[in-house]
Amino acid sequence: LDIARRIQEGLFPKTPPQTPGYDIAGWSKPADQTGGDYYDWIALPHGRVAVMLGDVTGHGIGPALLMAICRAYTRATFPTQTELQDAMRRLNALLSEDVGEGRFITFAVAVLDPASGEVE
């Protein structure tokens, strides 16, 4: 479990995004050695940044693995989509195939445009 915890900790972002006029940070401390907590930020075209926050139901290795899958799909999906709704639909479709019955992922995303101050 200690190895799984270190791997999971390595999946969280190491440095904050460069967002002039804004400070973005994150920190997570799971109740057990591993868990399903998720936060991330991804640089998008035109200086925008997507900030994500999620939680997989449960504690332990299973939710930690689903969190890692969620992170991988998110990082693969968001930079390729120009519209937030399209990215969320694609992410939902991918995750729906992998999340077993009785499990779910709560997920929220905000897209910040530091130049205009708009949040979507």
Q: What are the functions of these language-model segments?
A:
Residues L1-E120:
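… and, occasionally, acidic/histidine-rich disordered N-termini of signaling adaptors
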